[in-house]
Amino acid sequence: MATACPPLSLPSTSLFRGRSARAGPNAGSSRPSAAAPSERRSWRRPRPDGGRAAAGERNQREEVERPPVWLMRQAGRYMKSYQLLCERYPSFRERSENVDLVVEISLQPWKVFKPDGVILFSDILTPLPGMNIPFDIVKGKGPVIYDPLRTAAAVNEVREFVPEEWVPYVGQALNILRQEVKNEAAVLGFVGAPFTLASYCVEGGSSKNFTLIKKMAFSEPAILHNLLQKFTTSMANYIKYQADNGAQAVQIFDSWATELSPADFEEFSLPYLKQIVDSVRETHPDLPLILYASGSGGLLERLPLTGVDVVSLDWTVDMAEGRKRLGSNTAVQGNVDPGVLFGSKEFITRRIYDTVQKAGNVGHVLNLGHGIKVGTPEENVAHFFEVAKGIRY
């Protein structure tokens, strides 16, 4: 089992090892500098008893040499090695549901760039067939839900997701990834948030205006709440399953929650996210949980109320402002604009340093504000990681 692997020993990835980082009073006050990669500082290990720590104890500051770094969608379509693999295996579902392919794709950026986090190659919709919701991902169109859930009867047919039965390849892949990266990086899993999953399932796929999910929310809220509860129970179980099989941190994607007004977010997203976090805390109190919601500027103060350890900011929120609005007990991730990777190397460097300086020297995971875009030059991604790993506080 992956849980037998030793804990991460790299100081730069301490935020993934234990839930102890915080913004602190000096966030944004220090300027990063370049230093030799051999420099190291001490850091605090997770609680040896594995028990629940008090809030203050969980959030004690850790001294680290630099912010850990990984990128959303770091494994994917911008890489030539991935493009060649797609020619052999054109079906996305085959690539994301075959153990060997999942491991190979997940490790492609690790072998080239050596990020501090290696995220499982998968999709937030992967659990749907196990919940009696058939779907596919069609090239040029995206996710397609064959039988959208738009009635009480349809929602009643949705069953609880049992990961061991429906996605054993996820657990197998996570175990292999832990063995492959050993103690040199954190292995990350991820899940979709209840409202985002419900949006896909009610709309029938991606949407520009979310008319159908909002129609259900505002005219038949009981039906939507029933569906959200089913996703909540299932995703909590899925996070635990991933952790039991080697995931050292899990990111929750609530991509479409920002289509809701603050009041509607508090009804249709926030309580279910909090329920997931509370459930995971009962069995996995030291598992770091990250929440990403694109375009979350209007909801920012509400995101820490979910109880997650890290809020991942998109690039439309200034990092320094985001720090202030989130408060000192929430770590941050992000938030370089993915478009920056199309700029010159000098420009990329400036943006990285600006982000790190504004984030401060504790409780920050360097990342993009969204996934890497198709067509991003690989050499610029390599430069991003080179600069990031050369930073010293």
UniProtKB/Swiss-Prot annotation:
Function (record text): Catalyzes the decarboxylation of four acetate groups of uroporphyrinogen-III to yield coproporphyrinogen-III.
Residues the record lists as binding substrate: R73, Q74, A75, G76, R77, F92, S122, D123, Y200, S255, H370
Name under which the protein is recorded: Uroporphyrinogen decarboxylase, chloroplastic
Alphabetical UniProt keywords: Chlorophyll biosynthesis, Chloroplast, Decarboxylase, Lyase, Plastid, Porphyrin biosynthesis, Transit peptide
Originating species: Zea mays (Maize)
One GO cellular component term: chloroplast
Annotated pathway: Porphyrin-containing compound metabolism; protoporphyrin-IX biosynthesis; coproporphyrinogen-III from 5-aminolevulinate: step 4/4
PROSITE patterns: UROD_1, UROD_2
Catalytic activity from the UniProt record: uroporphyrinogen III + 4 H(+) = coproporphyrinogen III + 4 CO2
InterPro entries the record matches: UROD/MetE-like_sf, Uroporphyrinogen_deCO2ase_HemE, Uroporphyrinogen_deCOase
Subunit structure: Homodimer.
Marked site positions, Transition state stabilizer: D123
Similarity comment: Belongs to the uroporphyrinogen decarboxylase family.
